[in-house]
Amino acid sequence: MIEGISFASFVTHEKPKFVRALDFYKALGFLPTKEYKHGTDHHATDEEGAGSIQEVWLTSSRAGVPSVTVKLRLSRHGNEHVSLPNLKHDWRSLVPSLVYYAPDLDAVRAAITPFLHEDHSTLLERPSHTNFIELYAIDPMGNLVGFSRRENPYSSAMQKPFSADDIGPQNFSKPNETKIKGKKRIGVMTSGGDAPGMCAAVRAVVRAGIARGCEVYAVREGYEGLVKGGDLIEPLSWEDVRGWLSLGGTLIGTARCKEFREREGRLAGALNMVKNGIDALIVIGGDGSLTGADLFREEWPSLIEELVTNGSITAEQAERHRHLDICGMVGSIDNDMATTDVTIGAYSSLDRICELVDFIDATAQSHSRAFVVEVMGRHCGWLALMAGTATGADYIFIPEAAPDATQWAEKMTRVVKRHRSQGKRKTVVIVAEGAIDSDLNPITAKMVKDVLDGIGLDTRISTLGHVQRGGPPVAADRVLASLQGVEAIDAILSLTPETPSPMIALNENKITRKPLVESVALTKKVADAIGNKDFAEAMRLRNPEFVEQLQGFLLTNSADKDRPQEPAKDPLRVAIVCTGAPAGGMNAAIRSAVLYGLARGHQMFAIHNGWSGLVKNGDDAVRELTWLEVEPLCQKGGCEIGTNRSLPECDLGMIAYHFQRQRFDGLIVIGGFEAFRALNQLDDARHAYPALRIPMVGIPATISNNVPGTDYSLGADTCLNSLVQYCDVLKTSASATRLRLFVVEVQGGNSGYIATVAGLITGAYVVYTPESGINLRLLQHDISYLKDTFAHQADVNRTGKLLLRNERSSNVFTTDVITGIINEEAKGSFDARTAIPGHVQQGGHPSPTDRVRAQRFAIKAVQFIEEHHGSKNNADHCVILGVRGSKFKYTSVSHLYAHKTEHGARRPKHSYWHAIGDIANMLVGRKAPPLPETLNDEIEKNIAKEQGIIDPC
C-alpha cells in the first residue's frame, strides 16, 4: 500500500508503546523482515543498535518501487519526543516528520484510526478533512508520520497538475484523469472577432499541453491559416508564449474565412492537419467559429477518405488520423454564448465601457448634458445591461427586453424627467447596437438623441466601437482564460470517437464542459426567439443572473424621493454601517440598498464612521440618506459614510440605546472579517438588549476575501485589477533591464487568496502564502529554480519576473529579507528589487464586476430584512449574505462562527481556491516545492547522525 525511498529508525524505552507501534505499522502493510532481542545467541551488527533491548525491522515494497524500511527499537534510554502543546491547529511543523507516498489515503486513514485518540486530535488532514491530499498522524511512539498522494514529496520533479475542473466551490476533489495515448499534436487557433484574453488562453493551452506531454501547434490567421497551411501552421514552444498573459487581442492572428465554409476549403484544412501530424484542434472564438469546428469534425472521416482516394495522403497516414478531436473555447466580448455564464473577453470589454462612461460623466455633469452611448451586442444585451448597472445609467435598451414600439420614447422621457427633477444634472442612456422595439424596428442612438433633444436636453452621441475590444485583459478574463485553457487540454486528452465535441464553459464558478453543438443551438435560439417577437423566451434562455440583474436595474432605477414605485407592505427604518478597511464596491452597495429601499417606501439611514462613530457622536452619527446624495456613489471608491475597525464591544449598551432611540427595523453591515465579528457580537447580545432583536445581514466587502460563508467579497476584484496593472508595469521595467526579479508584497491578511490568484494572472514565478508559509528549504528550492530560469533566458526578451509574497506569509522571511537572500545567492547572475504596492491595492474606482455584484448583494440584503421583519425566530435573523457559485445564500453567523472559522487566522476553515496555485505553478514551470521543513528538523537530523541513527533522507 505504501511506496517511498526512506529508511527510518524510531526508539522508545516504553514496552507498551513499542508493541502498539509494531501493530500500527503492520496495519499499514509493513511486514517484519528482521528481529533482534538482547540476550539471544544473535550478536548485534553495526547496523543494529548495540544498546537495544529489542529491534524489529519492517519493510513495505512493491515490484519496481524502492522499499521503505522502518526500524523500531526498544532501548533502555529511548528518545524523548517533542510534545505537541496545541493540537487544535496545524502542528505539522512542531516536530520532525517522515512522509510516505500513499495513493489510497482513505485506506491509510481506515488502517490507523484504531490507534488514534478518541477525539482524533492526533490526525491532521490537509487541505481539509473532506478533500485531502496529505494525511499526518502521530504513531504510538510519538513520531509524526505523513502520507501524501504525491509520489515523492521531496523530489524536484513537477507534480501532476490539478485539472481546472477542480476549481470552484464544492468542486475540489480529485484531479480530472486523462488518458494520453502516445504523444499528441494539438492545434490551437483563434477565429472570428478578437477578444481580450485570447492570448492568455493560447498561453495556457500551449503550456498545459507541453506539461501534459503533448506538442502544440499554432494555426495562424484562424481558418484561413488552416486552409492555406505552410508557414501559417507551426509549433509553439514554452518560450514562444512568454509574456502573452497581459496582451490584448491575439498574437496568432484571426480572420473570417469564406473558403472554410465550402467543402473544398475544409478538405484543404484536413490535408494541412495531416501533413503536420495534428489530430486535435482547440478553437477559440464565437458561435460561428465553433459551429465550423464541429462540422469539420463531423466530416473528418469522409475528408480523410477523399484525401486517400485522390492520393494526397497514404493509407498509413489515414490510419493515424482516423479521428479528429475538437474542443471549443468561447472568446467573445458580447457574452452571447448559451450554457456558459461568461465568455473570454466580456469582463475586459465591460471594463473599457465603464471607464469611458465614467469619463463621459465628468463632461456631462459640467455642461448638464445628456449622452447616448452605443455599445456592442447585436443579439445580446449583456454589455449594455451590466454597463448600465455599473455606471448608474438613466436608461438602457437591449434586444432581449424590447420595449413597446409606441411607448418606449414616452417611458424613457418620464424616467429622465423624474431624475432631472430630483436634482440630477446629467443623463446617460446606453443602447446596445442590436436594440429593437416590440415590432423588431431598430432603436438607434440617433433616435434616442432625437427624443432627448425633444425635451430640451443638450444631447451628444458617443459610439464606443472597437475601443471595447482593445487593451489588456482584466484580472477576471485572465483567470477565466488560464483555467479554461488548461481544461481544454484535459478535455482533448480524454475524448473518444464517440464523445461529442465539448465546449469549455463557466457554470456556478466551476469550469465545466458542455456539448458544443447543443450550446451553439441554444445560442441561435435566442436570436430566433427575438426574431419571432418571443421576448419572454429570449429572457428565459439567458442565465438567471442576467434576469435578476435586469430586475435589479429596473427597481433601483425607479426610485423616487417622494413616491415609492413598488411600495412594500410595511415601510421600514433600515440602518447601514461599514466596518473594517475600505473596499471597492462599498459605495455601490450603499447606493443600491438606498435606491431599492426608496423604491419600496423604506427609510434608509447611514451610521457614519462605524461603531465608534455611533458611540461617540450619538444621533449626530445617524443620518437619513437621500436619493440625490447616493445616486452618484456607484463610481466612487472608498467609503463615503466612513469606516474603521471598531467593533460593537466598544459599548454594546450605548449602541443598543441608539438603536432603540432610532427605532431601527433592520441592519446592514458592510465589511470584512470585522463585520463578521461585529454581527456575532450583536447576535450574542440579543438576549440582553431587545433593540438588537432585529434582522441583521452582513455584506462581505474586503480585498482579503476572507469572510466565512462566501466565495467572493466586494473589493477583491478591484484589488486584483489594481495588482494586475501594478505588476504589468513592474514586468515591463524588469524586462527592460533584463535580468531582474521584483519581490512584490501583497495584502490579504492571513488569507492567501489575493496572492494565489494574482500569481496566476500576473505570471509570477513564485508565490508565498500564509497557508503554505516560507522556510529555508523552500526558499533555497525557489532560488535555485529562479537561477536556472534566468540562465536559460539570458538573451531573450520579456524576461522580467515576479515573486509574490503575502504580507503575513512569514514573520521571519520578510520581503526585504527574501530580496537580500536572493541577491546574495544570485551572485550577480540576476538581481532582485522590492516592490510594495501597499494601499494602492484597495483601488480607486471600483471594478465593474464589484459594482454589479454590489447591486445584487444590496438588494438581497434589503429583501432579507423585509422578509424577516416581525418574525419571532431570532435564531436565523443574523446572517452573512454570501455567494456560492453564482447563487446567493444566507448563512447564520452563529453557525459560521462556531463551525466554519479559523479565528486565530481570521479566515474560513475551507476555501475553494487553493488548487489555483498548482495550476499557476504549472503554467510558469515551477517545480513542486518540497514539503515544509523547520530548523528543528535539521537539528534532529544532526543529532541522529551523531548517534548513529539512520534518518530518512
Swiss-Prot record:
Keywords: Allosteric enzyme, ATP-binding, Cytoplasm, Glycolysis, Kinase, Magnesium, Metal-binding, Nucleotide-binding, Transferase. GO terms for molecular function: 6-phosphofructokinase activity; ATP binding; fructose-6-phosphate binding; metal ion binding. GO terms for biological process: canonical glycolysis; fructose 1,6-bisphosphate metabolic process; fructose 6-phosphate metabolic process. Beta-D-fructose 2,6-bisphosphate binds at residues 645, 702-706, 740, 747-749, 807, 833, 839-842, 906. Substrate binds at residues 332-334, 369, 376-378, 433, 460, 466-469. Pfam families: PFK (PF00365), Pfk_N (PF18468). This is ATP-dependent 6-phosphofructokinase. It comes from Yarrowia lipolytica (strain CLIB 122 / E 150). The gene is PFK1.
